[in-house]
Amino acid sequence: MSALDVYVDGVGLWSPQLADFESLRRVLDGQSPEPPARRPAAVVLPANERRRAPESVLLAAEVAGQAISMSGQDAATVACVFASSHGDQAITDYMCATLAEVPTELSPIRFHNSVHNAAVGYWTIATGCHAPSTAIAAQRASFGAGLLEAASQACSEQRPVLLVCSDFTGAGPLLEVTACTQAFGCALLLAPTRSAASVARLRLTLTNARPSSTLNPPLAGWRESNPSAAALPLLVQLVQGHGRCQVEAAPQLGLQIDMESVA
């Protein structure tokens, strides 16, 4: 595959320690930013939807909204790729337990929210988006797989594409398998051409090498605690304005990312 060149026009970020991308910048500067509220605000969703949406949806909508706001794009016209390693683990745990014990009491609303593309569904409805949307799962390679898909769409279709990658905390027996101990979500608005909003250019190249990008504490621990936090090496580069990192895109496939600032 030829290298893919895309521009980053917007960034979104949320975790229990980081309210947004600027908070990461402050952490890397040695500061201790104020942590966000316990639940992501997700102000892009109508109030009624925010009340009934699961936290996994709020997380995805929050970081997506941040990236769109930073880019100045109209969310209604932007194609999107939503990636998640495990979807909503709390609902999956609830459904498994309920089906095993009292299947007739399974909540239709929680079942509705259990599907892997629930977050992208809430997003496209809330924003009135009729552009193409994609939902991807690739276990711990979900960020890399999502980035490859979003960049491919941006280059082939010559249009901006919103990438969202998020996972919420695991629950029940699933937590022993997923080891997802805290929430993490990020979003990138990728564009095929440079604009006034562009902050960096990414060159993506496929490689057979295993990802080897290192992180310092506390970021290394955050990456281990959530598969979507595999994005952290790239997010650190975006703060620093240059660099090269690798992320996993499939079990035997890596994605090398060379970044340079254009801001």
Placement of each model-derived feature along the sequence:
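Active-site-proximal alpha-helical scaffold in enzymes
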Residues: 60-65, 137-161
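Conserved "HGTGT" condensation-loop signature of ketosynthase/thiolase-family condensing enzymes
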Residues: 1-86, 90-110, 115-116, 120-133, ...
